[in-house]
């Protein structure tokens, strides 16, 4: 049985949350992280989902403040310089970052906080919060991943090639994370995440 550990002795951060729990969900673009996260939150409203900030344009159906905080590059760089992000990374030419204050407040109040972030950001979180539980979502195959990315119909061939190259590199990092879950059968993958979080 998997147990999610409380965050304690975060020696590499100024903050020292001791009562909450931090969960990091990551994996390559197109693997289904967002869909899994949405379903997880629908089933477990007690979870606190940290909404990331990004400089990329909204995709169809995305809502500002729910899917992401959509902000300008200048605003992002200003917040970054002020130390307002717990982690930040650049992906496909856009910045992504996790607002620091909201996450730390929720952890300190005893909440289970879940982050859905890119690999570079997940590595930053692991360095700052070694007690965090990290979950890496894998595709059933590289061919399926390419099919999913192409199925979005949003990227040029050049952008797709970049995403696939990056995915190859990211998949090689899966073993760095506490748990690896293959998103082949959606319901099974979702249940595996629930077991990791709740036992």
Curated annotation (Swiss-Prot):
It is an enzyme of class 2 (transferase). Residues 20-198 form the Guanylate kinase-like domain. Belongs to the guanylate kinase family. Essential for recycling GMP and indirectly, cGMP. One of its GO terms (cellular component) is cytosol. Keywords: ATP-binding, Cytoplasm, Kinase, Nucleotide-binding, Transferase. Its EC number is 2.7.4.8. This is Guanylate kinase. One of its GO terms (molecular function) is ATP binding. It holds the Pfam family Guanylate_kin. It is found in: Cytoplasm. CDD domains: GMPK.
């Amino acid at each position: 049985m998997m147990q999610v550990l409380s965050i304690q002795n975060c020696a590499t951060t100024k903050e020292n949350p001791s009562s909450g729990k931090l969960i990091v969900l990551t994996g390559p673009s197109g693997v289904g992280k967002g869909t899994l996260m949405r379903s997880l939150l629908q089933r477990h409203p007690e979870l606190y989902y940290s909404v990331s900030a990004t400089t990329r344009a909204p995709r169809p159906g995305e809502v500002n403040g729910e899917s992401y905080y959509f902000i300008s590059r200048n605003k992002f760089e200003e917040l970054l310089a002020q130390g307002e992000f717990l982690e930040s990374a650049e992906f496909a030419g856009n910045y992504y970052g996790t607002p620091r204050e909201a996450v730390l407040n929720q952890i300190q109040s005893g909440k289970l906080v879940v982050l859905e972030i890119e690999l570079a950001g997940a590595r930053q979180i692991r360095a700052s919060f070694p007690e965090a539980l990290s979950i890496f979502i894998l595709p059933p195959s590289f061919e399926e991943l390419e099919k999913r990315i192409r199925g979005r119909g949003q990227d040029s061939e050049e952008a797709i090639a970049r995403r696939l190259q990056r995915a190859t590199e990211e998949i090689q990092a899966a073993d760095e994370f506490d748990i690896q879950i293959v998103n082949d059968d959606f319901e099974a993958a979702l249940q595996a995440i629930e077991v990791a979080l709740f036992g």
